[in-house]
Amino acid sequence: MSMSIYDKIFPPKLLTLPNGKQVSKPRSRAPLAAVILVAMTILSVEVTGFDMGVLVSRIKEFFVILGDMIPPQWDYMPQIWQPLFDTIKMSLLGSFIGSILVVPFAMLASTNIIHSRVVVAAMRLLLSIIRTLPTLVSALIATYIFGLGTLAGTTAIAIFTFAYIGKILYEEIETVDMGPFEAMEAMGATKVRSFISAIVPQVLPSYLSNCLFCFEGNVRYASILGYVGAGGLGLILNEKIGWREYASVGMILLALFVTVFIIETISRAARKRLV
């Protein structure tokens, strides 16, 4: 058996068993991993220009800004309602559109449903390409196409949901019991009809649970899409940070925190019933 360079430098330890037979125990790779990690960290610091001294000396500014946010400006709340509702609407509609549109694509990306390697590879490549596109970039592109406003934000969230749910869904489809599906096909049912009747009931609980989980995250993502003009809380958040009105920023963040907490609580309870 050929030995690696590491094993040649650090020979395996010989152990004697009770029956007298000797076996070799390879040396741990932990020291090598630690050296590589330290080297990569040093290289990253050099490339990025990270300065721990600046971080330590300026960390107090964070607490200064945090102090300016407390207490929040309560009388600014009436101006928050509409952008907050826009954020929720973008998240809900984008999540719904993306999760519905991706179902046929997830079906085409499943190897146990579609036996054409070309089709499966093409669908998975499409989902991978879309998944690598940052939501902010999608929103920025959408603003050039649809203009400023919530339509661009909704489109960006739908694109993200499409890619996120698509990968999870086709992986879930590939783990189902294929017996009912094959039986329906044997009786003459079409592939689509067999999929709807035999596969969908098996993946529906986890599919709905993942959609709810994705919606939770989309509410948070939607709140920053306003930085590229896609509507929602991000618009006024960017404005107030720019004007250094930190008390208003504190009120916006508090409203967002409460909203996300309520949505997550409801979603968590719903997902427990589904799974």
Name every feature range the model reports, one short phrase each.
Residues 95-103, 107, 111, 136, ...:
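Hydrophobic positions within alpha-helical transmembrane segments of bacterial inner-membrane proteins
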Residues 81-89, 123-130, 212, 216, ...:
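Alpha-helical membrane-interface segments at transmembrane helix boundaries
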Residues 233-270:
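Hydrophobic alpha-helical transmembrane segments of polytopic membrane proteins
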Residues 105-139, 168-171:
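Cytoplasmic-entry segments and transmembrane alpha-helices of multi-pass inner-membrane transporters
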Residues 191-225, 247-255, 259:
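Transmembrane alpha-helices
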Residues 1-96, 103, 108:
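N-terminal, non-cleaved signal-anchor transmembrane helix
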Residues 127-161:
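Generic hydrophobic transmembrane alpha-helix motif, especially the helices
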